[in-house]
């Protein structure tokens, strides 16, 4: 999952570029399939929605495309600028582009955006007629075991369980209908289970991606982390101590009519 902070102030996810690079690098590393779907071409104008630290934005730029990265995390945008990329701060719910892009691309960001219909309509406005929308993000069933464990511990401790799973993880049927309602021509929408190795362990994943859930427990944060990890150990950790997250991804390609 890749950063885009979009929730209210009390539950807002924040990001450190250094921490993300250390514990979340797999997000960009595992994006080969959706990048192939995008197939960027030289001189195309492309919007990378939820660009994060610019790892994939750089890959798009390397093809000769004219790419603009958009994100809400200033720290991650700073890291992207250090790569020499063109990026700006912006909310995926309030895209202010009009028929500017040949393609809109997004990897591991759309599940952070809680009003998907607004996002889809903004993407449609941003695209030129005949432009394409290509994205991958969390699909139905993504990190279900992890969220269930957090909710269980949160309930036992009297915490806000909603902070365990703030994401939008649609099925292909639901998302296809949303795209059609926004007048997109749906080319393909696929769901792919993708068990994902966590090289730095489950606790680092939890701290990186669900900080607001754990911080609500104050001085008990470390103990709550321990409890969630122990609940997950039997199903997501092997005999050698290697952790795997139960990722499920939805991959999308749609076209704006000419």
What label would you give each PLM region?
Residues 168-182:
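Short alpha-helix
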Residues 103-116:
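A short SAM/SAH-binding and catalytic strip from SAM-dependent methyltransferases
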Residues 1-44, 55-59, 76-79, 134-157:
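Conserved class I S-adenosyl-L-methionine
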Residues 187-240:
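C-terminal helical/coil "lid" or tail adjacent to the Rossmann-like core of SAM-dependent
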Residues 93-104:
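A short acidic, Gly/Pro-enriched loop at the edge of an enzyme's catalytic core
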Residues 117-132:
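A short glycine-rich, Lys/Arg-flanked "PGG" loop and its adjoining helix->strand segment in the class I
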Residues 47-95:
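Class I SAM-dependent methyltransferase SAM/SAH-binding core
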